[in-house]
Amino acid sequence: MSEFVTTSAGDRVAYDRRGDGPALIFVVGAGPWREVDPDTTRTAELLADRGVTAIVYDRVGRGESAVEGVITLERELAAIEALIDVVGGRAALCGHSSGCSISLRAAVDGLPVAALALWEAPLAPPNSGAREWADEVNRRIDAGENAAALDEYMKDMPPEILEIVRSIPAMIEQAPSLRPDGESLAWAESAPHAQLFGGLRIPVLAMVGEATYDIMTPAAESIAAAVPGASWKPMPGSEHGWEPEAMAAELAAFVHATHAADPVARATAR
């Protein structure tokens, strides 16, 4: 059964909590919510078996986290902050796709993020057009053109994926929740990554699937080069998704190692 937390922005966010141990919060990318994302839930279940508190939540404006008004990046960050409070005040974040740029922004903005595990961050080099693209997505959202906003957001995805996404009515209904994704990606391309992320002093692991899109490996390499001590690696996965067993094993090792080396996290857990 879902649990709920109210954020500082007044939004009621639904989440599942599993396991007992150092915490990790999954931050999904554009579109998914718990009901249609079994791989993230399965990964959380496997993490719980490995001594990790795993949080899977419905992003603001999706699933059981329904809201009114403009869904800003700030509201999404407030949701992450509230969930960090739920698990004791400090947590690792696992971003997926544009959830990576949201997670990076959370850490850069000073939320109590213990570590970042980033799966296939779709970050292009600076000034690659993300600002203009996000503005167009936002324009269509503001005009009430949800289907057009979804099409614009996913215009660079393979047509067969867009066809699947458009076949799910809730994806179109929840298109306003894409604004934080676009805004975070535009921010992540607004300057060199070393300038944006280079001040982070937390463990960062960027991952890509062994079969992935052309943009993903250079992005992972760039993140690893930008953040002191960060690393990247290929993992079992394809078509932008991971394999739950392998991902859970990797995340559990990462979270436990991070926790063991982080005196703030250990103090928070007591």
Residue ranges of model-derived segments:
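Catalytic active-site module of serine/aspartate enzymes centered on a nucleophile-bearing elbow/loop
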Residues: 228-270
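Conserved alpha/beta-hydrolase catalytic His-Asp/Glu region
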Residues: 144-182
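Conserved serine/cysteine hydrolase catalytic core
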Residues: 170-225, 233-244
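Short beta-to-alpha linker loops that shape the active-site pocket of alpha/beta-hydrolase fold enzymes
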Residues: 58-62, 122, 236-238
